[in-house]
């Protein structure tokens, strides 16, 4: 089935041909964690998104994108796949301290217990906290809607403009620039996967993921 095919983050057994640029995949090493969602549309199958992730950074903008119901769905998906969630609230420079506190209060009201880091790609707030969380040999991913600043964050972590970023609109909303999944290696040996923004986020069975996502 399509679930058994390699996805980003998989470790595979390969046999190289005459040139090391060509190889055949013989097997996929069993996954220790995974990200999957319900296939778009009415299909009841699920789509494997990524594998072998240690920490998922769930990214939402404080300014235009924040939606606690969407955040809950991301948390269920991440916890179901045995991945540790960390919430990144971006664009804090575009909201007042009172507006930011309202966002944080809505998260607490939903009994969400995941770690939260507030970020601004303009002022650099929170960047060092994210960098300190990323350990050598571990794999991380960025999950969020289009335009919340994930590509800019990756470029900051890499220390260079390795990925294209979109112009920011007058509302502070970035334009969608990630069209495929990227896996990049940071200088310290941590691996980071950038995901395209998800227009549809469906969950098939939320039992275990639901239990792990919220306080009792």
State where each predicted segment sits.
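Helix-rich effector regions associated with P-loop NTPase G domains
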Residues: 3-19, 29-55, 83-85, 92, ...
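Canonical P-loop GTPase G-domain recognition
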Residues: 93-148
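Walker A/P-loop
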Residues: 146, 150-152, 156
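Short, charged beta-turn/beta-strand-edge "cap" motif at the junction between a beta-strand
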Residues: 16-21, 62-64
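Conserved C-terminal guanine-recognition region of P-loop GTPase G domains, centered on the G4
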Residues: 43-116, 214-216
């Amino acid at each position: 089935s399509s679930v058994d095919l390699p996805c980003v983050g998989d470790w595979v057994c390969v046999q190289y041909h005459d040139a090391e640029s060509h190889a055949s995949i013989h097997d996929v090493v069993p996954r220790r964690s995974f990200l999957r969602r319900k296939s778009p549309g009415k299909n009841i199958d699920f789509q494997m998104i990524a594998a072998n992730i240690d920490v998922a950074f769930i990214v939402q903008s404080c300014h235009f994108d924040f939606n606690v119901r969407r955040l809950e769905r991301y948390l269920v998906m991440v916890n179901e796949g045995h991945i540790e969630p960390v919430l990144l609230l971006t664009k804090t420079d575009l909201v007042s301290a009172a507006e930011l506190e309202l966002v944080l209060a809505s998260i607490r009201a939903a009994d969400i217990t995941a770690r939260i880091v507030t970020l601004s790609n303009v002022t650099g707030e929170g960047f060092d906290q994210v960098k300190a969380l990323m350990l050598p040999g571990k794999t991380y991913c960025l999950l969020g809607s289009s335009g919340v600043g994930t590509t800019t964050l990756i470029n900051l972590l890499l220390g260079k403009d390795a990925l294209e970023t979109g112009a920011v609109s007058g509302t502070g909303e970035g334009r969608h620039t990630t069209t495929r999944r990227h896996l990049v290696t940071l200088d310290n040996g941590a691996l980071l996967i950038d995901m395209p923004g998800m227009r549809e986020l469906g969950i098939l069975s939320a039992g275990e993921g639901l239990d792990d996502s919220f306080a009792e």
